[in-house]
């Protein structure tokens, strides 16, 4: 999207490691309008300090912070409380939870959502969900907290098991101390749940 579609609309992207706030700030240009990142990132599970990135808005007031929170929905992580302006989710994953809806949601202040709705909906990004798909997404939200907590508990147990396996070279999971700085940030902002997603490298 950022390399092939957005340039058609006069939008260019600079790619940086958002876990490194100094690198993010160094990449800001006069015409920068958005800092967009996914945390934890797929598939590396690197964790961006949302509050630290959001502090850049104190210096660069025209910039919006957009966080893809698909891997860490409530009750794991609350980007807006940490200073983000807009949060996006693929509701096909955790929010729906039943594999029978394809869609996404954008969350934020009414003023920001009004701009997105007026400029993008139906013109660029597609149409709203059908009523039945919306109903099924709401159905999934009723069990979201229960499902997510169990996913996270199971993922942590599996990650710890894999980390001690002779067949596994490296496990990437924010809830493991071996993730270093990513773990430290995850402890601070992910409410002790981390995520239900794991990636790992198998030994040759």
Tell where the protein language model's regions lie, with residue ranges.
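Conserved PLP-enzyme active-site core in the AAT-like
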Residues: 1-167, 172, 177
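Conserved small-domain helix->loop->beta segment predominantly found in fold-type I
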Residues: 156-204
């Amino acid at each position: 999207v950022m390399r092939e579609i957005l340039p058609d609309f006069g939008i260019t992207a600079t790619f940086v490691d958002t876990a490194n706030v100094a690198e993010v700030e160094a990449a800001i240009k006069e015409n920068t309008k958005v800092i967009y990142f996914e945390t934890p990132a797929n598939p590396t599970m690197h964790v961006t300090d949302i509050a630290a990135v959001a502090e850049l808005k104190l210096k660069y007031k025209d910039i919006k912070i957009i966080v893809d929170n698909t891997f860490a929905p409530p009750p794991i992580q609350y980007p807006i409380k940490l200073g983000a302006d807009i949060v996006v989710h693929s509701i096909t994953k955790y929010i729906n939870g039943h594999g029978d809806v394809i869609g996404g949601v954008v969350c934020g202040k009414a003023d920001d959502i009004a701009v997105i709705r007026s400029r993008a909906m139906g013109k660029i990004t597609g149409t709203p969900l059908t009523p039945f798909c919306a109903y099924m997404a709401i159905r999934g939200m009723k069990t979201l907290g229960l499902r997510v907590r169990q996913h996270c508990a199971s993922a942590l147990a599996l990650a710890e098991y894999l980390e001690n396996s002779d067949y596994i070279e490296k496990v990437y999971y924010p809830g493991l101390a071996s993730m270093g700085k990513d773990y430290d940030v995850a402890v601070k902002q992910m409410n002790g749940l981390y995520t239900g997603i794991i990636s790992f490298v198998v030994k040759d």
